[in-house]
């Protein structure tokens, strides 16, 4: 039993939405599921698994420029911004930080719904609760000398 986790992150690598599919399912299924919930953005960075003409067209209809390298099997190569594509490592870093949680890394939960809930909990704690904590206050000493 294996699964694929598809994710959308913001420019800082914080997760915005997740979708889980079976491991043998094509990446196009995850792309189609996440397409409706995409936030307003200028660019969409994705790996070769998301290279499909219908997906590129759907992104452009939403006003999003795709930055997805073409599959090796394409007859005509697709041009993409290689400099911008380098920043895709932020999503890989996000997946790595999620796997710091042992329950997520070892796939402790066999039920996909419970596993997905563990991922959502880990993402909430790692990325969103840490940004909501108040800034440290400046300590003012009032000692009299």
Positions of predicted regions on the chain:
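Polybasic low-complexity intrinsically disordered regions
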Residues: 1-73, 122-123, 135-145
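Short hydrophobic "helix-edge" motifs at membrane interfaces and signal-peptide entry regions
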Residues: 37-38, 81-83
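Basic, amphipathic alpha-helical segments enriched in Lys/Arg and hydrophobic/aromatic residues
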Residues: 56-63, 82-145
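Short, conserved micro-motifs composed of acidic
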Residues: 76-77
